[in-house]
Structures are given as C-alpha cells and as structure tokens.
C-alpha cells in the first residue's frame, strides 16, 4: 500500500500557492479515485453488532464504544490532505481511514495476536499482512489490486507535468 513518491508534499504546496485551480482539480480527481474503494469498504462493515454486548443500549453509561452500523459505515472516509510526518519522516499524501472508534476496532481486532482465536463470531475476512491487515478497508484495497494506487500516482504525476508546463510558460 505505501509507495515512495518524492516531492509530493512540495508539489501540493506549490500547486496551492501558484496554481490553486490545478490544486482543486487534483484534489477532486483524487477523491474520485478513492471514493469507489471507500464505498466498497463500507459494504464490508457488518449490519448488526458482531459481538454480544457491543450493541447500542439506550441508557448505557459505558465508556467502551458501542457498535452502531450506520456510524461505523459513515466513519470510513478518505483524506486528501497530507498527514504529519511520522518519526521516520514518512507522510501520506492521501489516505483512507475509519474515524469511528467501533469501526476502527472491528477493522483491526485480532491483529496483535493472529495465532490466537480472538473471536470467531466477529467474522469478516482479514486481508493484508501485519500492520496493513484489516476486515473492511484493507480488504477493499486488496481486492482493488493496486489499480487505485497506480491511478493516484498517475494523477499526481499529471498534476506535476501540468504545473511545470504552466511554470515554463511564465
């Protein structure tokens, strides 16, 4: 899933500063590429609470997030703004994430100890390996087989070429 693309963040900043219309066009194009994967991932979220005791209760004061399928599905979204650099200096130009707590738990549950039987009732086939393993987002990305990733890279490269052509004309 991760791809090393040098100068991507600098390109986005330069586009925003010198060619805002091209920056908006690029963001719109990236959104169009990521939207089908997010919609497919939403389809993999269970319609009911996958575990007993995880369903929403009317008068519960529990702090642990309860599973509401609508909130979990709405929580899957894409982000087209660059992330902060991690301790190794890597940044994500675009990402797909689950912003709901219960949805994120469902996505990654059982990843820490894959040899153990976390809960067979949780269901959902996990796809990917290691930290890039999950039940909905990673499964949708895995089924996409890198088509979206290649299209995103091409979109960024196209924006770079257009920007350089505009810069050369000035």
Predicted segment positions?
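Residues at structural and domain junctions
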Residues: 1, 12, 23, 62, ...
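Short, low-complexity, charged/polar segments at coil/turn and helix-coil boundaries
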Residues: 13-127, 164-170
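Lipid-handling modules and contact-site tethers
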Residues: 114-170
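Generic hydrophobic secondary-structure signal
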Residues: 11, 15-18, 30, 137, ...
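Disorder-to-helix initiation segments
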Residues: 1-20, 130
